C-alpha cells in the first residue's frame, strides 16, 4: 500500500512537473510568437514607411528618362512628357476650372502642331539649300524619316486644314449619352452608346497624328504655300524690312524668289519667323527649368518676374506675339465676354486658348531637341536634353550625400534641393543667342536663397552646410559651360538654319 502511495505521489509530481514544463514551453512559444510578430511588424514599417525610395523617386525617374533620350534610345519620350505637361504649366487660376463631362479643350493643341510643322518644313527647306551635303543619318537615329524632296505647299495645307476641320467638327464636344442596356440584370446600369465610344477613340487617334507632325521631316515649296496674293505696299514693305537681317531673306535670294509675289499665307509664315527670332535673341533661353515655372507671371521692365525672384525675359511676349500673328480665328477659343460676369463657358474658352498657345511654344521647344531644327545652332548631340540629365544626376548625388547626415527623409530632401540651387548657380544656361539679365547677382541670390529656405524651416546651421556643399559642386556647372561652349562653337561654323541673323555673332564666336 505504501509503495502504491509512493508511486502515486511520484506520478502526481511528474504530472505537475510535466504540466509546469508544458506551461513554461507554452509561455515561451507565445512570447516567441509575439516577438516574431513585433519584429516582422517593425521590418514592415521599415520597408513600407521608412525606406528611402532610391531609384523610384521622381528625380531618379526623370533622370533615367532623360538619359534614355540622351542615348538616342527613346527620343519621343520627351514629346510624351511635354504633351502630358501642358496641363501642369497652365496658370494657377485656371487649374481649378471644372470642365463638364464631354467638353474637349484639346482641339487647339492640334492647330499648334500645324503651325510648328510649317515652321519646321521651312527650316528643312533652308537646310536643303544652304547645307546640301548635310548628313540625314541624324534623322534616322531619331526615328524620323529622311528628306525625300520638297512637298507642294497647297497640298500640305489642304491635308492639314481638312483634317483639322474634321477634327473640330467631330471632336469639339465629346458626348457621352447614357443608354439602357437590357443585357444587364442590374437595372441601375447605364452604358454609353457604342458609336460614341468609337467616335471618341477616333478623336484620340487624330490627336496622335497631329502630335506626330512636329517629328516629320518635310520640306515645303514656299511659292505654293497659299492661294491668294494680295499686295498692300505698306504691309509688304514692313514685313520685308522685318526679314531683311534674317536667314529667310538669304533663302529667298538663293531660290530667286520675289517676296512680293509670294502667297499671303507664305508671307505670314515668313513674317512670323523674325519676330519669334527677335524674342528669342533678346533674352529668352531654352533652359533646363522652363516646364517647372509659371508661364504667365507678371511682367516687369526687364521681362517677367518669377515667384522666386528670378527674371525671365520676354517669356510672356512669346504668347502674346503668337496670338497677335496667328491666322486662326480665335473667337471660338477665346470669345469676348464681360469680365464682371464670367461664365463657366468663358473660363473653358480661356483654358482652351491657353492650352493652344502653350502648345505652340512647347512644340517649338521640342524642335530644338532635334537636329536640324528651327532655332538653329542647337542639339547636334542633344546638348539641351543633356542639361536635364546632368541636373537630375547631380541632384541624386547630392541626395545620397545629404541622406547620410539627416535621418528625416523629408528634411533631407529640402537640404538637397537648397544645395542644388547653389551648385547650379554658375550654369549660364544658353549659348545659342545673345541674352540679357538672367538672374540676380550672387550675393542677392544668397540673400533670397536664405530667406526662402528659412521660411521652409531649415536652420542656419543646415543652410551653412548646404551652401558649403553646393559651392564645392559648382565646378561641375563651370565644366558644363566649357563643354557646351565648345559644342556651340564647332556647330556654328558649319550649320546655317532659318532662325539666324546675318552677321550675328553668338557667344561662341564672341
UniProtKB/Swiss-Prot annotation:
Coiled-coil residues: none
Record keywords: Host membrane, Membrane, Signal, Transmembrane, Transmembrane helix
GO cellular component, one term: host cell membrane
Subcellular location field: Host membrane
Principal location class: host cell
Topology term for the membrane: Single-pass membrane protein
Residues passing through the membrane, by range: 28-48
Signal sequence, start to end: 1-19
Protein name: Uncharacterized protein 510
Organism of origin: Sulfolobus islandicus rod-shaped virus 1
Amino acid at each position: 500500500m505504501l509503495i502504491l502511495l509512493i508511486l502515486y505521489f511520484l506520478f502526481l509530481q511528474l504530472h505537475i512537473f510535466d504540466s509546469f514544463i508544458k506551461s513554461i514551453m507554452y509561455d515561451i512559444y507565445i512570447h516567441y510568437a509575439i516577438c516574431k510578430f513585433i519584429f516582422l511588424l517593425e521590418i514592415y514599417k521599415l520597408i513600407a514607411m521608412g525606406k528611402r525610395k532610391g531609384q523610384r523617386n521622381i528625380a531618379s525617374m526623370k533622370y533615367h528618362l532623360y538619359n534614355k533620350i540622351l542615348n538616342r534610345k527613346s527620343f519621343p519620350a520627351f514629346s510624351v512628357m511635354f504633351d502630358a505637361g501642358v496641363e501642369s504649366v497652365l496658370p494657377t487660376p485656371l487649374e481649378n476650372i471644372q470642365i463638364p463631362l464631354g467638353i474637349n479643350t484639346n482641339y487647339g493643341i492640334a492647330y499648334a502642331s500645324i503651325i510648328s510643322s510649317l515652321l519646321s518644313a521651312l527650316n528643312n527647306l533652308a537646310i536643303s539649300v544652304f547645307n546640301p551635303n548635310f548628313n540625314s543619318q541624324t534623322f534616322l537615329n531619331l526615328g524620323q524619316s529622311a528628306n525625300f524632296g520638297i512637298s507642294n505647299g497647297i497640298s500640305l495645307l489642304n491635308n492639314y486644314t481638312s483634317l483639322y476641320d474634321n477634327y473640330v467638327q467631330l471632336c469639339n464636344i465629346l458626348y457621352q449619352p447614357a443608354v439602357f442596356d437590357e443585357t444587364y440584370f442590374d437595372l441601375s446600369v447605364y452604358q454609353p452608346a457604342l458609336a460614341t465610344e468609337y467616335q471618341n477613340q477616333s478623336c484620340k487617334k487624330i490627336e496622335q497624328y497631329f502630335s506626330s507632325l512636329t517629328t516629320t521631316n518635310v520640306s515645303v515649296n514656299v511659292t505654293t504655300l497659299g492661294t491668294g496674293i494680295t499686295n498692300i505696299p505698306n504691309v509688304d514693305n514692313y514685313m520685308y524690312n522685318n526679314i531683311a537681317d534674317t536667314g529667310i531673306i538669304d533663302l529667298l535670294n538663293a531660290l530667286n524668289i520675289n517676296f512680293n509675289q509670294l502667297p499671303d499665307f507664305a508671307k505670314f509664315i515668313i513674317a512670323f519667323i523674325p519676330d519669334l527670332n527677335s524674342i528669342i535673341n533678346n533674352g529668352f533661353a531654352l533652359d533646363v527649368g522652363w516646364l517647372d515655372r509659371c508661364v504667365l507671371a507678371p511682367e516687369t521692365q526687364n521681362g517677367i518676374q518669377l515667384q522666386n525672384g528670378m527674371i525671365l525675359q520676354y517669356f510672356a511676349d512669346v504668347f502674346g506675339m503668337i496670338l497677335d500673328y496667328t491666322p486662326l480665328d480665335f473667337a471660338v477659343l477665346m470669345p469676348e465676354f464681360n469680365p464682371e460676369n464670367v461664365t463657366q463657358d468663358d473660363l473653358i474658352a480661356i483654358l482652351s486658348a491657353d492650352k493652344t498657345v502653350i502648345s505652340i511654344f512647347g512644340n517649338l521647344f521640342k524642335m530644338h531637341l532635334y537636329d536640324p531644327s528651327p532655332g538653329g545652332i542647337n542639339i547636334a548631340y542633344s546638348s539641351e536634353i543633356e542639361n536635364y540629365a546632368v541636373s537630375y544626376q547631380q541632384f541624386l548625388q547630392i541626395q545620397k550625400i545629404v541622406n547620410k547626415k539627416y535621418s528625416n527623409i523629408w528634411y533631407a530632401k529640402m537640404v538637397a534641393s537648397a544645395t542644388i540651387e547653389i551648385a547650379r548657380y554658375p550654369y549660364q544656361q544658353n549659348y545659342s543667342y545673345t541674352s540679357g539679365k538672367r538672374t540676380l547677382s550672387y550675393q542677392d541670390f544668397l540673400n533670397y536663397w536664405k530667406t526662402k529656405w528659412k521660411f521652409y524651416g531649415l536652420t542656419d546651421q543646415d543652410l551653412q552646410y548646404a551652401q558649403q556643399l553646393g559651392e564645392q559642386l559648382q565646378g561641375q556647372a563651370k565644366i558644363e559651360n566649357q563643354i557646351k561652349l565648345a559644342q556651340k562653337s564647332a556647330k556654328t561654323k558649319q550649320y546655317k538654319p532659318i532662325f539666324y541673323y546675318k552677321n550675328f555673332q553668338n557667344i561662341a564666336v564672341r
